Amino acid sequence: MEPEGTSALAAGSRSLFLETVRRSNAACQNGDYALAASLYTEALALDPLSHVLYSNRSAARLKMGLFALALQDAVRATELSPQWPKVMVFFFSCY
């Protein structure tokens, strides 16, 4: 499943975006949360309205103990998609 917003990206940007998201997800699964957060930031530069990416970066930052930054991302994901329940877990975990 492709992240939201990829259809609006130009072909070159779209492939870069998808590869960056793939790498960020792999880094997170491998426990390299710093790399994952950095790659999610790169992907967000290409698609700044992706609630999924903000949520994923929030989770990575939460795992690194960066609670204030994780909360900022959780808040932004909630602003972009208020009905998305997954982000609420990260939101409340920051407290």
Where are these regions (language model features)?
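Alpha-helical tetratricopeptide repeat
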Residues: 1-95
